[in-house]
């Protein structure tokens, strides 16, 4: 697809032509991957997962990659639901310039939702997901992103 055709297609289908991101997920050779993912530096489970339900999911999904290295997600877990928030701790911006953090945190939360879906499916937990639009300014600490009803 030529650049001009892609631009026209994106505009026709309602995509902002300046905002495109893609993530590839694939199985890689064992010798190309981290030997022990639990040795990587991530936020502790209690910092991102509120509640005692489904912690086995939280213990894995907390390893979701983060562009800003801020891991901007919080989950409130109940027996039959998960509520996901984009979380921005005041003064924390990771490796990104301050004016780019909100943009990349929105991308990070999308990647997190993908990993959360995959973890739920791997554990054979059925779900329905409701997504919420994030049009907030950068001054909000928690923004409702998704609600999962667990089946």
Where are these predicted regions, by residue range?
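Acidic, surface-exposed loops and disordered segments
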Residues: 1-151
